[in-house]
C-alpha cells in the first residue's frame, strides 16, 4: 500500500477510533469490566487482518489456550510451538512487515502498505513489547512466539473489542506508563524499528518471551484493535512522538485482523498491562499492593485503587485529548493514535497531563522509588525467576516477598516492558530499570512476564493464570525454559547481578522518571553499561549471530543501535539523557531485541561469547585494564561500556578482529552460563570490551602502531632516500669536531632542522603528519628527516668507516655527474633530497658501496635533484665528503670537510610544478613550526624550491608563465624569513648570522635576476624617457624668454591647447610641444614608463646593496662560508645562476641543520 492508501486507511481508522472511543467512554461504566467477553470478529475483509492472521495464526487455534486462564493449561499447551514455527516462518514476514510497520510507526508516517503497516505496527506493538520481552527474555522458543502471536490475535480481538476499554484503561495505565510507554515504544519502535529485523527474528526465537510482547501488544492491543496502531503507537508516540508522529500507519494496522481477544484476558491483560504500565506507578504500591493491580488509581494516583471507576477515569482520560507528554506527539496530528493516546494521556495528565511525564516522573519517582525497590525486588525476582526458570509456582504463589517482589519485578518486568514499550518516558528510568529489567526482563520477562503476568494477576491469581501472556508464557516457558531458562538461569544471575547494580541504578532510575534518561546514566555503571553492553554487545552479537540466543539475547540488547547506544551509553554514564534520543530506551528496548538479534545473529559465535561469559569479570577486568591502558578510553566505565559493547561486538567479531586477540582468552574462555554474575559483568564488560577492543583498542593501538610505523616509515624512507641514518651518525663525528664552535648553533638548528629535514624531503609528508611527533623524536626523525645529509653526517659518524669506504665510490660517480652538470644542470630533481643527497651518499653506504653509489645517484636524482648548485663543487665536495665523512669519524678541527657532509644533488630536470609542490610542502612545514630558527630554515628551504621552480619556468620554453612573479614572491618570502631571526639582535647566534647571509645572498641574486629579466624593457624605458625629457626640456626653453615675467609662476595661456597636442606627441614618444615653462604636461604613458623603469633599475640597486651587506656579514662567519665555498664553489654576484644559488643555499642549510642538530 502506498502512503495515500495508508493515509486513507488511517483517516478511516481514526474516525472509527474516535467513534469507538466516544462510545467506549459511555460503554464502560465504572463498575463494568474493562473488556467485554472476547468475541471473534468475523470480518475478514481487512487485508491487514488477513495478513496478520496468516502470520500470527488463527484465533480459533489459540482461543482455547488464550481463553483458558489456567496457567497449567497454557503451560501444557505445546501447540504454540507449532504455531511458533508457523509464526516464526511468518515472523520473517512478520519481521519484515513489522519492521516496516515499526519503521513506519517510528516515523508516524504511512510508510509501508497500510495493512502491512497496521499489521507490522500491531506486531510492532506486540513485537515491541515482544522486544521488551524479547529483550528481557533474550531467548524464547518459537512456540511461545507463535503462541504469543496467537495471543496477539486473540488480543487483537480483545483489543479491538475491548479496545475502548482496554485502550482507555490501557491508555490510562499506559498513559501514565505511556509517556514512558510511548517513549519506550517510540524508542521500542525505533529500536524495534532499527532492531525490528533482528528483534523480530529474535522475537521469533524469543517469542516465548514475547508473552511480554503479547501482553504489551495486547495492552497496546486495545489501542491496536480500535486504535491498533494508535494503541501501539501511543506508547511509542510519547517518547518518539515527533518521529513516531509520522507513523499514523501504525494506526492503520489495527485492522480487524487480530480479531478475537477475550475481554477477560484483555481486561486482565489490560490490568496486567495497565498494571505493567502503571507498574512503574503501581510498583511502589504493587510492592505493597501487588494484589491490587488496579491500574486506574495506580496510574492516576500511583496508588493501588483498582476501581473500575478509576479505569473509567483512565479511559476517559485516555479518550480525553491531552497535550502529549512529549509535546512533539501532537505534531503528528495525522496520527490519530497520538490523538487517542494523548486524550488518554491528557486524561491521565490530570495526573500526568502535559506534565504527565513530570507527574509521571513524580508519580514514578514516588512510584519509582517504590518501583525501585520493587524493581530491585523485581530484578531480584527476575534473577531468581530467571535462575528458577519460569517460577510458575512463584507466579501462582502469592510470592509474599518474592511474589511481591516478583510481581513488582514482573510488573516491573511488565512495567519495564510496558513502561519500556508503553512508557519510554520512564523507559529512561525503566529503560535503565527497563533496560536493567529488560536484561532482567530478558530472562525475567520470559519468566518475569510469566510471574509478572501472574504478578499483576496475583491480586487475582486466576488472572495471572488467565493472563494470555502469562498462560502463553507458561505454555511457552516450558519450551522456553529449556532454552530460555538455561539462558535465564544464566541471565537471571547475571541479571540478578545486573539487577543489583540496576536496583541501585534503578533506584536512581526510578527516582528520576523525568531523569529516566539519567537513570540509564544513573545506572551507567551497570545500566548504562548493561545498556551499552546490550547495545554494543548487541552489535557484537549482531556480528556474531552464531552465538546462543541466551548469550546473544542479553548481549544483543543494544545491538541494533550499537553505535548510538555506545555513545549514549558512554554518555549515559555521564548524562544519560538519551530518552529522547532513545538511546537508553532504545538500548533498553534494543537490548532485548538486539539480544534476540544477537541470538539470531550473534549465534555464530556462541561459544566464544559463552566462553567469554565464563570469564566475564576477568575479561572485564582485562578489558578494563586494556581500556584503562588505552589513552582514548576516558573512563573504565565508559570504556567498559564501550568495551562491553565492543566486547559484544568484539566477541562476535572477536575471531576476525584484533579484539579477539586482546580479549580472546577472556572472551573465549569457555564459560558456563551458570556464572551469571560473571556473565553479567562479562556482558557489561565483555559486551563493551569487544567493541572497545575493536573501536578503542584498534584505534588506540593503531595510533600507537602508527606512531612507531611512522617512525619506521621514516627509517625506511631514510634507507630508501639516501640511507642517511647511518651517515647521520658519522657527520655527528664531524659535528663533534664542529661541536665546539657550532654546538650551540647545532643545538638551535637541531630542533629547527629536525622539522625542516623531515618536511623537506620525502619525509615532508610524514613530517607534516607527524610534525609534532617528528619534533619529539627528532633524533629518530633526524635520521628520517627530509634533509638526510645531516642524517648522513650522523650516520657517517655511526658508519664513518663504511661511509669512508663507501662514499668514495659513490662520491666518484656523483662527482663525475656533478662536475658534468655543474653549472649547466640546474636539473636537480627535487630540493627535497638535496640534503638527502648527501644522505644519498649515506644511502650508498646503506645499500652497499656499489649499491649505495647507485642508490645515492638514484636518491640524488629523485630527491636531491637540483640540490647541488655546482656539480664540480659537489664532485669536489663529494670526494671531501667521503674524506669528510671519514674525517668526521676522526674528529679534527672544525674544518668544513671533516665535519660536514655534502649533499648529493640530482641533475635531472623537473617540471616547475614539481618544485612548486615541494616548495609548498616546505613552506607548510615551516608554518607549522614554533621554533623561529627552525621555521626560518624551513622557509629558506622553501625559498630554494621556489627559486628552482622559477628557474624551471625560465628554462622550459614550453612554460607559458613568466618566472618573474615567482622570483618576486620569493623575495618577499625571504624578507619575511629574515624577520624571524634578526642577526642584529643582541641574542643573535652564529647560526642566525649564517642563515641571514644565505638569505641575503638569495635575495640579492633574486633581485639581480629580476633585473635581468626586465633589463630589455628597462633599456627601452630609459631611451624613451631620455628622449622625452630631452624634448620636454628643449620645448620648455623656447617659449620661456618671450613669456618673460608674465609666465613666471603662471601656466602659459597656450598650455591648455598644447597639452593635448603634447600628450599626443608624447604618446608617440616623439616631439614635444612646449607649454609655458611652468606647465609642461607629461603623457600618462611616460609616467608608467618612468615607474617601471625605476622599479626595474631598483632591483639592480637592491641586489648590489644586499650583496654587499651579505659579504660584510659573511666575514663574521668566515670558516663556515669558506668551507661552503670550497665545497659548493663560491657564489659570484653577476655570474652565478639560479641553480648554483639553489644548491649553494641548500648545502648551507643542510649544514646549519646539522650544526643545530635539527638533523642527526
UniProtKB/Swiss-Prot annotation:
> Where is the sequence biased in composition, kind Basic and acidic residues?
1-19, 193-212, 408-424, 563-581, 608-622, 725-756, 764-784, 794-806
One matching Pfam family: AF4_int
> According to the UniProt record, where is the region Disordered?
1-42, 78-289, 322-908, 1031-1070
Q: In which tissues is it expressed?
A: Highly expressed in testis by Sertoli cells, and at low levels in other tissues.
- Carrying Phosphothreonine, the residues are 669
Q: What is its main location?
A: nucleus
Give start-end positions of Polar residues composition bias: 115-128, 268-280, 360-370, 398-407, 483-496, 505-523, 544-555
What is the recorded name of this protein? Answer: AF4/FMR2 family member 4
**Organism whose genome encodes this protein:** Mus musculus
Q: What is the lineage of its organism?
A: Eukaryota, Metazoa, Chordata, Craniata, Vertebrata
